[in-house]
């Protein structure tokens, strides 16, 4: 046996090399498919399986073999188990067969081992239609003995299906013995020992139901036969039940429980016994999916008790046909469900409850058990409200007060309101005095226990009724009349108070209060003196009170002091008490002074021929101090009645001697003496030829008689009282000649005094001129030394803005040397024969004095007449920079009335001829027919051959001569329209002809859906006529784009560079909210325009409004810097003489002023990178005198120019429904910067406390927000998704005590409202934790995922204003920048949040802007970066330490680069 086993491999090798094809002649002796193996398996078309583990071996009777002698003799196929590992298999494949009738396959087999061990297993497999191998249909294992055994295969697979029988030998663990087969026969009749199955039919069933296969077999069902249902993939299902049909036929049932689509496959029946096996054909299990609608029902109509729907059952998921349609509906708040069968496309649901939400679904049914599919998507809708059932019951009065009434009513349930949304309104009306009525309706809270009507008038009949209203109707209660209680009365009307003054009494009357609020019972008047013209009157006494009856509305107050102001308080009273008092001040009249009694007293002390000396005694003031004493001389006439001494009618009109002489007056004033000159009796000489207070006291005429009067006068405000007395009489002399005083001598004396004074004044003026010249030379030297210190001057400017400059006089409109703006600002026409040429020409002195001066250092020579080239017209003088803030504030009062008046004074419309522009051949070249080029200033193009009209383009020269460094620049600007399609070639001709290097574009191509400018430049290269324009570089920034072109012309060996500066930050309507971006834009253009270049081409759409704004601002910035003044009004006026309607709106005119003011206040704050380190150290140096630094002053300037938000700016954040979404109500985002949420989340609003911010290069690149509150976490993730944010920067800590929860999943996946957030990874790098999230919107899954990285910064302690490390914070910024460049092609936004969305977040944004600024422009401008952020949100970079930290990080970045 061992020898034979050892020799078997050699035998196998010889067998494999045997020439089997030569034995093909023996095939004819076998039936198809059978084989006796006399000539080997190949002769029977049997094949070894190429993919098994080893081969069957052929044993031939004609060839020697080495099998043990006890093995059968003859030819057969054998497997030696001892040569193979357990589990290895050998397969022998019979040829494929197609039989059309019942047949049988029988064969011989043995399993033998010398020691009686298990040699392995013989399996029979049947493959159908070249499908997969299933489990064996028959097998035998273990030792069977030395003799051959027979077995049968009853295969019930019929044509056209084909099958293949496979014999498989499997080695067992014993590895000993042989497995052999022989004499395989295919018989044309049924098997004798194994039953044959009838054809197995397909089974169709609905998903979720049980499927049953019934296999019917012909033959005897032996007790030991094994039956099962075999699936094509090898799964075996046991038999459920067998049943004998008759003595030769039985049935077997197989059941599959609750089948699904995954159970749909091919199945066959198998029976097995020791004698053989039977196998049926494969039948298909077909699983049908019950139908379900794709779409929900569609609502066609709705009423209070019905819903009309369309089923929408044509598009389904699942299988048809549909044999039944049903509608299933229920209240969304209830649990019961009703189902109605429907046989029409539409269905009306009746008997529903009003204002109730229903969920409606459609059910579809196909044939078969379980054919009803799942309900389709729901239609959730609500019925309309129904009219209220009845009128509310009568109101019950719960409380009556003077100004409020409390009412209540029955509880209003749904059975009354018939609607969940209803209003309870109390309407009331009442009549006031003068037949005035008042009516109003108040919405009440139906759930409140009591309802109060406030703000009612006291002591008034009020009619009330309640109205119950819902969207479908209203019911009103009966009207109830109630009288409110009395209250204290209102004040006595101020206008009704009238006081009539006398010297010692006041008559006061008044009217009843407009709001008596009941029955007036009395009036009370309190009064006291508060001041007096007479110092002797006491004014600090206690107030006195007078009470009047209710019907007495006047009173006379006696025994008062003259010239004294009394304050009266009048108040009325009802039974409820006194109301508020009304005050009035009344002043008693003053009394005339009291003069001493001269009756019987001779006041004459001495008398000469031309004089008389009298004794003057002081008067006694009564109610007002003495203002003056007057001496009146009256000439005696013999026929005039003599005045009596003592009290008399005084002389009120002062008349000088000269006027009396020429006018024939009978008296004249000889002197007026101040009261201080007469503290006690003193002599006075009448006729002493002296002048007193302008009154000449001439010598008296000896031959005339005179009465001498002494007057005392008291005068306060507009009241004057005079008392006079005759104190002496001088009789006429009888002998001396008459001497008449000569007024001419008095005049000569005055002239002499004036001449001496003038000489002294001239000397002083000459001295002042010398001082001014010396001062001026010193000032010029100081200005030259201070050229590099712009920041210090800016700070001084802010600190000194509101001071009055006593040493610098303003420009006066009366100056006879004032000239027009065209004259004084050197606007020069282009053509010498221009009718608008000014005649004034500046001389060398103008040029010499026009040296560059600092922007904020206003030069003294502005006060020196014609020396300044910036004096202006008489009506609108230039404004000093130092006075600009005050001027603008004044002009903005009363709704900017000053600006409105100035702007409306400009000439509107055409002011010069434009015949060329109006020609028919030029009409298509004008964008607007009313804004075209004037003839006298138009740009004349060099004509194209054979086209005389080709010299026209809608453009005008704007001429200005700037004396800067001795260079004159006529035609500094060209103002033109935005090109239309027909003028693109002309536009480039103009740029080439005028040698322009800069194009300024102040419009977008399309605004509000209208084309504003044709795209006249290429993205790459384009040819326009004979011009080739190539775009070589484009630099997009947040508010403007800089494009660099090369310009070539056919026939010219020259390539020019032209830069286009396209300002994109001008809004579609109005003007920019702030001028910061435009000012930066203008500075960039100035720096880029070469000194030798031609005019700057400026255009918007029409070339008037925005173009004019740009040019005026540019001119005025130069003017302010050179001369310290601005003249906006006359500049606009001059520009309008060159092109129609430059600066088109009042809003633009105001914006120009605001822009100039911002430029003057802020100054130039950019520092070149190469100078930054030295400049920064200079900025932080503390000045020993001021104890401050330039950096601190700059931050104070920043605070002063930061706009303050008003309540109306944040109207959306202030809405009541948004209050709980704000962490701090004093840190709200303005409406104009809000990112409104797009994704809907139930009833949540679209508001979030966040603001869009510009970065250096990209508008709205940053979103700054507060740390999410517990109730805004969902909103935060909506914000991230809706605005494509790829970075989240977290600058504060998680702190539940401050309402700062963890808003992200640490691992795995969480859902926040409609947004699903999945944490993909988490890592830590120094002070930064990096988390990557994958988020998607579950309401819009088709949009895919958004990858977001969160940067949680750990290096900033909560109690510190700045981070602990500059380097780590800079690293954070650079990490975020790198991630942003990698994600979404750099287009993703960055969300930055701290506790309040202010200081910390602003600092991150500001440093990010500065880093980009350094990369792009090689400058550092922290002031501009923070100012730009604060224009949107004022709390960006809150503390001075944070502002300095921005500078520190900028320095760190420069030193590390």
Swiss-Prot record:
Residue ranges occupied by any Fibronectin type-III domain in the UniProt entry: 293-388, 391-487, 490-594, 595-688
Single GO MF annotation: protein tyrosine phosphatase activity
Record topology, Cytoplasmic segments: 775-1457
Known glycosylation sites: 100, 139, 210, 415, 423, 435, 461, 551, 585, 589, 606, 689
Database matches in InterPro entries: ConA-like_dom_sf, FN3_dom, FN3_sf, Ig-like_dom, Ig-like_dom_sf, Ig-like_fold, Ig_I-set, Ig_sub
Disulfide bonds: 215-269
The Ig-like C2-type domain, residue ranges: 195-280
Bilayer-spanning residue ranges: 753-774
Cited SMART domains: FN3, IG, MAM, PTPc, PTPc_motif
Membrane topology: Single-pass type I membrane protein
Family of this protein: Belongs to the protein-tyrosine phosphatase family. Receptor class 2B subfamily.
Name of the protein this chain belongs to: Receptor-type tyrosine-protein phosphatase kappa
């Amino acid at each position: 046996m061992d020898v034979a086993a050892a020799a078997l491999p050699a035998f196998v090798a010889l067998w494999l090399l045997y020439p089997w094809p030569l034995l093909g002649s023996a095939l004819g002796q076998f039936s198809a498919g059978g084989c006796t193996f006399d000539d080997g398996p190949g002769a029977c078309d049997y094949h070894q399986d190429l993919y098994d583990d080893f081969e069957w071996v052929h044993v031939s009777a004609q060839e020697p073999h080495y099998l043990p002698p006890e093995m059968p003799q003859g030819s057969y196929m054998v497997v030696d188990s001892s040569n193979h590992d357990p589990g290895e298999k050998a397969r022998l494949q019979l040829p494929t067969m197609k039989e059309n009738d019942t047949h049988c396959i029988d064969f011989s087999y043995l399993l033998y081992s010398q020691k009686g061990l298990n040699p392995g297993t013989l399996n029979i497999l049947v493959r159908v239609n070249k499908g997969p191998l299933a489990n064996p249909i028959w097998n035998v294992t273990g030792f069977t003995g030395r003799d051959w055994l027979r077995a049968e295969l009853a295969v019930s697979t019929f044509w056209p299906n084909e099958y293949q029988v496979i014999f498989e030998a499997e080695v067992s663990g014993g590895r000993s013995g042989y497995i052999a087969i022989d004499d395989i026969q295919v018989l044309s009749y049924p098997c004798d020992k194994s039953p044959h199955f009838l054809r197995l039919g397909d089974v169709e069933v609905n998903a979720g139901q049980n499927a049953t296969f019934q296999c019917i077999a012909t033959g005897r069902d032996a007790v030991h036969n094994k039956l099962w249902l075999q699936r094509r993939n090898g799964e075996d299902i046991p038999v459920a039940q067998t049943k004998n049909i008759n003595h030769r036929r039985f049935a077997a049932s197989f059941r599959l429980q609750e089948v699904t689509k995954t159970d749909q496959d091919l199945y066959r029946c198998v029976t097995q016994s020791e004698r053989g096996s039977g196998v049926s054909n494969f039948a298909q299990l077909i699983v049908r999916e019950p139908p379900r609608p794709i779409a929900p029902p569609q609502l066609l109509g709705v009423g209070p008790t019905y819903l009309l729907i369309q089923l929408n059952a044509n598009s389904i998921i699942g299988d048809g046909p549909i044999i039944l349609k049903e509608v299933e509906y229920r209240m969304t708040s209830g649990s019961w469900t009703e189902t109605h069968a429907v046989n029409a496309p539409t269905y009306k649901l009746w008997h529903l409850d009003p204002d109730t939400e229903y969920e409606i679904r459609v059910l579809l049914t196909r044939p078969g058990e379980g054919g009803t599919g799942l309900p389709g998507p729901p239609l959730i809708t609500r019925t309309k409200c129904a009219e209220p059932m009845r009128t509310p019951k009568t109101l019950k009065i719960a409380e009556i007060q003077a100004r409020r009434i409390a009412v209540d009513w029955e509880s209003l349930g749904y059975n009354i309101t018939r609607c969940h949304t209803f209003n309870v309104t109390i309407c009331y009306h009442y009549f006031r005095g003068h037949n005035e009525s008042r009516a109003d309706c108040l919405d009440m809270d139906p759930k409140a226990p009591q309802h109060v009507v406030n703000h009612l008038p006291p002591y008034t009949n009020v009619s009330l009724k309640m109205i119950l209203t819902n969207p479908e109707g209203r019911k009103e209660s009966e009207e109830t009349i109630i009288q409110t209680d009395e209250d204290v009365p209102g004040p006595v009307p101020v206008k009704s108070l009238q006081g009539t003054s006398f010297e010692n009494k006041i008559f006061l009357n008044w009217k009843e209060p407009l709001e008596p609020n009941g029955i007036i019972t009395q009036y009370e008047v309190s009064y006291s003196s508060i001041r007096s013209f007479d110092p002797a009157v006491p004014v600090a006494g206690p107030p006195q009170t007078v009470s009047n009856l209710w019907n007495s509305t006047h009173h006379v107050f006696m025994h008062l002091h003259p010239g004294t102001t009394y304050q009266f308080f009048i108040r009325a009273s009802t039974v409820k008490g006194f109301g508020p008092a009304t005050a009035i001040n009344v002043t008693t009249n003053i009394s005339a002074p009291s003069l001493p009694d001269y009756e019987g007293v001779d006041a004459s002390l001495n008398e000469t021929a031309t004089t008389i000396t009298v004794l003057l005694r002081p008067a006694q003031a009564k109610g007002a101090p003495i203002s003056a004493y007057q001496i009146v001389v009256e000439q005696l006439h013999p026929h005039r009645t003599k005045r009596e001494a003592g009290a008399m009618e005084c002389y009120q009109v002062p008349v000088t001697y000269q006027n009396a002489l020429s006018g024939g007056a009978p008296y004249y004033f000889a002197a007026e003496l101040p009261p201080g000159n007469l503290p006690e009796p003193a002599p006075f000489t009448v006729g002493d030829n002296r002048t007193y207070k302008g009154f000449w006291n001439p010598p008296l005429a000896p031959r005339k008689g005179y009465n001498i009067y002494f007057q005392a006068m008291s005068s306060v405000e507009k009241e004057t009282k005079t008392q006079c007395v005759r104190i002496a009489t001088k009789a006429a002399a009888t002998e001396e000649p008459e001497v008449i005083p000569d007024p001419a001598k008095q005049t000569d004396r005055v002239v002499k005094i004036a001449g001496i004074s003038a000489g002294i004044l001239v000397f002083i003026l000459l001295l002042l001129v010398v001082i001014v010249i010396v001062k001026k030379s010193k000032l010029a030297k100081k200005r030259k030394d201070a050229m590099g210190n712009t920041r210090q001057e800016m700070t001084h400017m802010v600190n000194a803005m509101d001071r009055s400059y006593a040493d610098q006089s303003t420009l006066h409109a009366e100056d006879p040397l004032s000239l027009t703006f065209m004259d004084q600002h050197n606007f020069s026409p282009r053509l010498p024969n221009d009718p608008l040429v000014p005649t004034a020409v500046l001389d060398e002195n103008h040029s010499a004095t026009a040296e560059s001066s600092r922007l904020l250092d206003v030069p003294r020579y502005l006060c020196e007449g014609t020396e300044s080239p910036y004096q202006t017209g008489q009506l609108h003088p230039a404004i000093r920079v130092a006075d600009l803030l005050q001027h603008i504030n004044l002009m903005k009062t009363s709704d900017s009335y000053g600006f409105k008046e100035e702007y409306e004074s400009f000439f509107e419309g055409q002011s010069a001829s434009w015949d060329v522009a109006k020609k028919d051949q030029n009409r298509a070249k004008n964008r607007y027919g009313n804004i075209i080029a004037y003839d006298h200033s138009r740009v004349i193009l060099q004509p194209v051959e054979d086209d005389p009209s080709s010299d026209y383009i809608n453009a005008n020269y704007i001429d200005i001569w700037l004396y800067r460094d001795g260079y004159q620049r006529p035609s500094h600007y060209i103002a033109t329209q935005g090109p239309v399609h027909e003028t693109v070639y002309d536009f480039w001709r103009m740029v080439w002809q005028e040698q322009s290097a800069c194009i300024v574009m102040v419009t977008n191509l399309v605004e509000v859906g209208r084309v504003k400018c044709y795209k006249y430049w290429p993205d790459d290269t384009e040819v326009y006529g004979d011009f080739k324009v190539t775009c070589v570089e484009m630099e997009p920034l947040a508010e403007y784009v800089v494009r660099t072109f090369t310009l070539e012309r056919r026939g010219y060996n020259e390539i020019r560079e032209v830069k286009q500066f396209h300002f994109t930050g001008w809004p579609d309507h109005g003007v920019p909210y702030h001028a910061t971006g435009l000012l930066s834009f203008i500075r960039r253009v100035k720096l880029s325009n070469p000194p030798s270049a031609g005019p700057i081409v400026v255009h918007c759409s029409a070339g008037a409004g925005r173009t004019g704004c740009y040019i005026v601002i540019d001119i005025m910035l130069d003017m302010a810097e050179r001369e310290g003044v601005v003249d906006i009004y006359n500049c606009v006026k001059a520009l309008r003489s060159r092109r129609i309607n430059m600066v088109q709106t009042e809003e633009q005119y105001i914006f120009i002023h605001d822009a100039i003011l911002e430029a003057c206040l802020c100054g130039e704050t950019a520092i070149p990178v190469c100078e930054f380190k030295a400049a920064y150290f200079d900025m932080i140096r503390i000045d020993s005198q001021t104890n401050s630094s330039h950096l601190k002053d700059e931050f104070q300037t920043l605070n002063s120019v930061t706009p303050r938000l008003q309540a109306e700016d944040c109207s959306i954040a202030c809405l009541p429904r948004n209050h709980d979404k704000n962490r701090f109500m004093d840190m709200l985002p303005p409406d104009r910067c809000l990112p409104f949420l797009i994704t809907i989340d139930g009833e949540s609003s679209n508001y979030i406390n966040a603001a869009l911010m510009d970065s250096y290069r990209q508008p709205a690149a940053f979103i700054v927000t507060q740390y999410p509150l517990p109730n805004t976490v969902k909103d935060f993730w909506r914000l991230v998704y809706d605005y494509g944010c790829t970075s989240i920067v977290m600058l504060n800590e998680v702190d539940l005590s401050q309402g700062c929860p963890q808003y992200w999943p640490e691992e795995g996946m969480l859902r926040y409202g409609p947004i699903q957030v999945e944490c993909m990874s988490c890592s830590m790098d120094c002070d930064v934790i990096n988390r990557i999230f994958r988020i998607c919107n579950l309401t819009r899954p088709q949009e895919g995922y958004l990858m977001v990285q969160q940067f949680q910064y750990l290096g900033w302690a909560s109690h510190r204003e700045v981070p602990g490390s500059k380097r780590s914070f800079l690293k954070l910024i650079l990490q975020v920048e790198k991630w942003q460049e990698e994600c979404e092609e750099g287009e993703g936004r960055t969300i930055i949040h701290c506790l309040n969305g202010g200081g910390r977040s602003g600092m991150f944004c500001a440093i990010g802007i500065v880093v980009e600024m350094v990369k792009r422009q090689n400058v550092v401008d922290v002031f501009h970066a923070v100012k730009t952020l604060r224009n949107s949100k004022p709390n960006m970079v809150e503390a001075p330490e944070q502002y300095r930290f921005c500078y520190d990080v900028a320095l760190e970045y420069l030193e590390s680069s």
